[in-house]
Regions:
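Catalytic phosphate/metal-binding cores of nucleic-acid and nucleotide-processing enzymes, i.e., regions
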Residues: 1-101
């Protein structure tokens, strides 16, 4: 479900001409997951910019929760003036509105 949701968000980013990037996790041979980045854990998975706006957002299932590390990033980033979101499939109308502004 989250993969379909992510695909829909990515399609909308493209259609609305956002410059965007998604940090995708990778699976190790032992089956564990990691995101090959240096620094502190928990950075939002998506970054997008258009017309002077900067968005950082995390996509979650309807029951998914941010980790403690993600909450720290969200709090710190909210002080910068960037738009910080946690989006779920039920947020689709708001997502469309946000990416269409």
């Amino acid at each position: 479900m989250v993969a379909q949701f992510a695909s829909a968000v990515e399609d909308l980013l493209e259609v609305k001409h956002w410059l965007w990037c998604h940090y995708r996790p990778a699976r190790r041979k032992d089956g564990s997951w990691y995101t090959p980045l240096s620094g502190h854990k928990g950075l939002m998975d998506y970054i997008a910019t258009k017309d002077g706006r900067l968005l950082l957002f995390e996509l979650k299932s309807d029951k998914g929760k941010l980790t403690d590390d993600q909450l720290i990033w969200k709090c710190e980033l909210s002080l910068t003036g960037a738009e910080i979101y946690t989006w779920r499939p039920t947020d689709w109308p708001f997502i469309q509105e946000t990416l269409t502004k």
